[in-house]
Amino acid sequence: MPTLLPRAAALTLAVLMPLLAGAQAVDLAGVKFEPQIMLGGQALQLNGAGIRYKAIFKVYAAGLYLASKASTTDAVLAAPGAKRIHVVLLRTIDANEFGKILSAGIQNNATREEFIAALPGIQRMGEASSQYKQLVAGDTLTVEWLPGTGTTLYVKGKSEVGPYKEPAFFNAMAKIWLGKSPADHLLKEALLGQAPRRQDN
């Protein structure tokens, strides 16, 4: 497919830019991800960032922030301290449909026990998504984990879900992008700070 190589190259650049640019922000399709942020009084660093594609279309840009670098899903989930997943839409999408896609992403990557543990947050996420008609380019979805506080989901900067004190909801949300059946395999590799492999199917 002719679109695969440019896409892989773009995502590889997304991974390498922090190394090449030092302390400069990573710019993906006009969305800037700062190399460091503060969350709950803790300094977090950009672990990786990339773009979610559907066919040739850019759907959203996403960045993962952790206290220290992690290159595997297990390491991300086990990492101590605060964590943030920040998503910025690059096109208009039906909010209710987006909520269903996220819920399906959780279900596709969670065990039955994990899904049940995260169910209160999943149900509230569905309720929250129904309050919005559309999400447009520039709108944000942010999932934050703060030890002692729990997981909170923000839509357009507004707290909509949580906080849930147990890590189950954050882990379930993280697996949408980092699980065995992620939303986008190349995006998963970018978030984990890995050079994306070219995909031929």
What is the meaning of each model-derived region?
Residues 1-5:
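N-terminal secretory signal peptides that target proteins for export/translocation
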Residues 10-19:
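Bacterial N-terminal signal peptides
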Residues 24-79:
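N-terminal secretory signal peptides
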Residues 70-148:
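Mid-length scaffold segments of soluble, non-membrane domains
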Residues 155-158:
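Short strand-turn-strand beta-turns centered on an Asx-Gly dipeptide
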Residues 162-187:
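Flexible glycine-rich active-site/ligand-binding loops centered on an Asp-His dyad
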Residues 185-201:
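Cysteine/selenocysteine-centered motifs that mediate thiol-based redox chemistry or coordinate metal-sulfur cofactors
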